[in-house]
A protein has these predicted regions:
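Blade/loop signatures of beta-propeller domains
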Residues: 1-26
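Extracytoplasmic beta-rich repeat domains
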Residues: 28-42, 52-61, 75-90, 115-134, ...
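A short loop-to-beta-strand structural motif that recurs across blades of beta-propeller domains
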Residues: 61-64, 102-104, 144-147, 188-190
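Short loop/turn segments that connect beta-strands within beta-propeller blades
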Residues: 67-70, 107-110, 150-154, 193-196
């Protein structure tokens, strides 16, 4: 499975040459019905997951699932706004955050919503960052809205209160040991404790 950007919450995975069987052949193509920005496809439970953007009308914004072998669309869930960046999947739950600061958790098998949370970014209204999951915890948002959530219930575990963003970025939250790493354009690189949310360094 390929559950998130570069396979793990540290974004340090990859495929070496010995795992690639040449020559590569196109197996299928599928139309998502909209554009894709920085959302990398996920592979989990014999499905491929992707999210879309629509900056013109916000009418064609979805999280989609396709059959891994055939490319047949299995389900499509409409989001309120564009999903700009990394989505993730763990234990049969797909999570994504949209530009309007909504955090979604969907059942990977059916696409049915399990829970939804609003990420309060205070004075910054637009979310373009990517999220991550590790050991049943979802890390999402940025700055004043940077938070940890229980994957199963959506319950907020902690919210960052130590720093606020002045602008957004195109980064994806990354875990290194017990540190959650995030950043903002021209603002800095931040490390927060993954257990408490306390800022450790900038």
């Amino acid at each position: 499975d390929w559950n998130t950007l570069l396979q793990n919450a540290s974004h340090s995975g990859g495929i070496n040459d010995s795992q690639i069987k040449l020559p590569l052949q196109l197996q299928w193509t599928a139309n998502t019905g909209s554009n894709i920005f920085m959302t990398s496809p996920l592979i989990a439970r014999q499905k491929v997951f992707i999210a879309t953007t629509d900056d013109n009308t916000s009418l064609n914004t979805y999280i989609c699932a396709f059959d891994f072998h055939s490319g047949k669309q299995l389900w499509k869930f409409r989001t309120e706004n564009s999903v700009k960046n990394t989505i993730a999947c763990e234990n049969g739950i797909v999570v994504a955050q949209d530009a309007s600061c909504n955090l979604y958790a969907l059942d990977a098998a059916s696409g049915k919503p399990l829970w939804q949370q609003y990420i309060n970014l205070k004075n910054y209204p637009y979310l373009t960052e990517g999220l991550t999951i590790d050991k049943g915890i979802v890390y999402a948002g940025i700055g004043a809205g940077l938070s940890a959530y229980d994957l199963k219930t959506g319950k907020v575990i902690w919210t960052n209160t130590d720093w606020k963003q002045r602008e957004g970025s195109t980064t994806t939250l990354t875990i290194a040991g017990d540190v959650l790493i995030s950043g903002t354009q021209w603002g800095g690189l931040y490390g927060n404790d993954i257990r408490t949310g306390k800022q450790l360094w900038k």
